[in-house]
């Protein structure tokens, strides 16, 4: 079980929160999280790079000049890979980079990553409830009250982020806002600071606590 402080919007302590999730064994935890990150990054690749082979590149099949008597190296086609504008040898073609991972392993990797970072978590009660209009300065001031550097990568996890909060954080380059249902291993491990809404913490317990 791991514990963290619950703070209000002013940065004052408003209670305690705890989380107890099943995690991977120490001997396999790093490998499991590593495979989960590789899978996530592989799935984000488009795989649309494509080049033309000598059979596909535009141009005639006529021999550019005679075989002998020119003093030059022999050439059989203007589409040969040896000439500028010719085909590409072993160039990339559209492909899928997706990696497979069992659902049970994916969930275990996510729980392991979350528990590993839980000591760095700051739970916030009623996050952004006082924001009536989108205001980036309010978010910046809030992070400053938590002693979070402007250069730190911050992950904010809420159960259902409102449009006001989304618009308030979208201009902050180092701040990423996600819904609790979109929680993932890469974002958890990549962030320097983790902020979780108190209601999002309940959602995480509900979704990931029964395995």
Swiss-Prot record:
The keyword RNA-binding applies. The keyword Zinc does not apply. SUPFAM superfamilies: Ribosomal protein L4. One of its GO terms (molecular function) is rRNA binding. Pfam families: Ribosomal_L4. It comes from the Bacteria. Disulfide bonds: none annotated. Residues 41-53 have a biased composition (Polar residues). One of its GO terms (biological process) is translation. Keywords: Ribonucleoprotein, Ribosomal protein, RNA-binding, rRNA-binding. InterPro entries: Ribosomal_uL4 (IPR002136), Ribosomal_uL4-like (IPR013005), Ribosomal_uL4_dom_sf (IPR023574). One of its GO terms (cellular component) is ribosome. Residues 41-85 are annotated as: Disordered. Residues 60-71 have a biased composition (Basic residues). Belongs to the universal ribosomal protein uL4 family. HAMAP family: Ribosomal_uL4_B (MF_01328_B). One of the primary rRNA binding proteins, this protein initially binds near the 5'-end of the 23S rRNA. It is important during the early stages of 50S assembly. It makes multiple contacts with different domains of the 23S rRNA in the assembled 50S subunit and ribosome. Part of the 50S ribosomal subunit. This is Large ribosomal subunit protein uL4. The lineage of its organism: Bacteria, Bacillati, Cyanobacteriota, Cyanophyceae, Synechococcales.
């Amino acid at each position: 079980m791991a514990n963290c402080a619950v703070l209000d919007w002013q940065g004052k302590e408003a209670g305690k929160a705890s989380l107890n999730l099943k995690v991977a064994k120490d001997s396999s935890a790093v490998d499991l999280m590593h495979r989960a990150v590789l899978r996530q990054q592989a799935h984000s690749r488009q795989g649309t790079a494509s080049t033309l082979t000598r059979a596909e590149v535009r141009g005639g099949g006529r021999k550019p000049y005679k075989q002998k008597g020119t003093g030059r190296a022999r050439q059989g086609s203007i589409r040969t890979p040896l000439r500028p504008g010719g085909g590409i040898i072993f160039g990339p073609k559209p492909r899928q980079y997706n990696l497979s991972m069992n659902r049970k392993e994916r969930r275990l990797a996510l729980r392991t990553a979350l528990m590993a970072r839980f000591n760095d978590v700051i739970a916030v009660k009623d996050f952004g409830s006082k924001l009536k209009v989108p205001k980036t300065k309010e978010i910046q001031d809030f992070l400053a009250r938590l002693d979070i550097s402007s250069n730190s990568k911050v992950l904010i996890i809420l159960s259902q982020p409102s449009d006001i909060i989304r618009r308030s954080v979208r201009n902050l380059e180092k701040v990423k806002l996600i819904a609790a249902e979109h929680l993932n291993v890469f974002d958890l491990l990549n962030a320097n600071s983790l902020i979780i809404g108190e209601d999002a913490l309940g959602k995480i317990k509900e979704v990931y606590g029964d395995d």
